[in-house]
Amino acid sequence: MKRFAVQDHELVPEHILLTPEEAQQVLMQYGVEARHLPKIHVTDPVAKEIGAKVGDIIKIKRKSPTAKESIFYRLVID
Amino acid sequence: MKLPDAWLKRIEDLDLPVSLKDALKSGLEEAESVTEEQFERIIKEVVEDYEHAKVEPCEAVGVVAAQSIGEPGTQMTMRTFHYAGVAEINVTLGLPRLIEIVDARKIPSTPTMTIRLLPEYASDRDMAREVAWAIEATSILHLGSIATDLAEMNVVIELNEDAMAQRKITAEEVAEKLRDATGLAVDQNGNTIIMAPEEPSYRELLQLVERIKKVTLKGVDGIKRVVIRKEGDEYVLYTEGSSLKEVLEFEGVDPTRTKTNNINEICEVLGIEAARNAIINEATETLREQGLQVDVRHIMLVADIMTCDGDVKQIGRHGVSGEKASVLARAAFEVTVNHILDAAIRGDVDDLKGVTENVIVGQPIQLGTGDVQLVAKRIDEVVR
């Protein structure tokens, strides 16, 4: 059985794991705490694929039908 | 005209969506000649227009989205079944499907998959058909006939040579599968298979027949039928029943373009972001198919709310509406008495911050200009 990368699927946008410094910068920029961000489970197939841990912040580059590309953030929870 | 690098850089640095930047660039390129002064003015106008077009703070986007989807929804056909082309695969569409999407039902009423194939399989009808047969769940009824011999108290299965060749399975494999599935002795002789129940009783015998009929000999459990359709210059498989995880691993299937209409399954296999995209696609497609045009932004908002917790949750009592902070807002939606009773027992307090609860108590809602509050300082404080 062959395996394929979940991120290659056309429904899945690009997920980028942020370093703690980058994450801090994002929180500063929006003036929010991490718990206010939308969530993603640590068991999510993409989160597993990029090796995210609980408490990390994932940056998602969505393909948007209106803005072409939009940035979204999710906090990894268990 | 060709844009100088400095201008391109200037456009890139603007706080605008990518689509607007692209439109701005191509618009400028088409123009005959633009002076530095004109360029600056164009940029200023574009940014101003963009800021103007943005949703203002305190705008009730949720209410607008609800109405924008709800009003066209009233014009949808109540009960529609659609047959996808000649391939008579039944798919729920119209209002029932829209309800199914926002209710985040675990299994849709008509699960179906769209399987796209790798280039070498997609162009060849015979190869596409082979993939289809490999995926379709094969039961004993596809391969031959099954009969009970009451004199001998056993089940006699006569396999059809052609049917087995077509589905690439041998009599030995069938016997092996049946042995594994039932745990009984299987007597295979050529294309005839004989099985007997543990206890020689009529009841056991008939039950055994039913069990044998249910065994999946080959293919994916739950995929009852696969049909092939030609779309453009590639063959695409449509299925009745859905099992994304297993189908993605099949030889010849293009795992990056294969989809299902089961949103929960997408969430499990491809993640929450894929589920969000699936909600948007399915909802837009359902509305579009009925000839209704709803701005995608409203549907995006619904999809965002449904997926913001990391799971797909429904818009309803067990999801978005049930999680509202306000007791009155929850009570206004469904099961009023339960919410008020529970709140009374717990001693909940309603801050009257939302729309619904303020309408209930007859106060101005905190939206738009109603959200701005004036705080007065006593004059002696100001003077001091």
UniProtKB/Swiss-Prot annotation, chain A:
PROSITE patterns: RNA_POL_H_23KD (PS01110). GO terms for biological process: transcription by RNA polymerase II; transcription elongation by RNA polymerase I; tRNA transcription by RNA polymerase III. Keywords: Cytoplasm, DNA-directed RNA polymerase, Nucleotidyltransferase, Transcription, Transferase. One of its GO terms (cellular component) is cytoplasm. InterPro entries: Arch_Rpo5/euc_Rpb5, RNA_pol_subH/Rpb5_C, RNA_pol_subH/Rpb5_CS, RPB5-like_sf. DNA-dependent RNA polymerase (RNAP) catalyzes the transcription of DNA into RNA using the four ribonucleoside triphosphates as substrates. NCBIfam families: PRK09570.1 (NF007129). This is DNA-directed RNA polymerase subunit Rpo5. It comes from Methanothrix thermoacetophila (strain DSM 6194 / JCM 14653 / NBRC 101360 / PT) (Methanosaeta thermophila). The lineage of its organism: Archaea, Methanobacteriati, Methanobacteriota, Stenosarchaea group, Methanomicrobia.
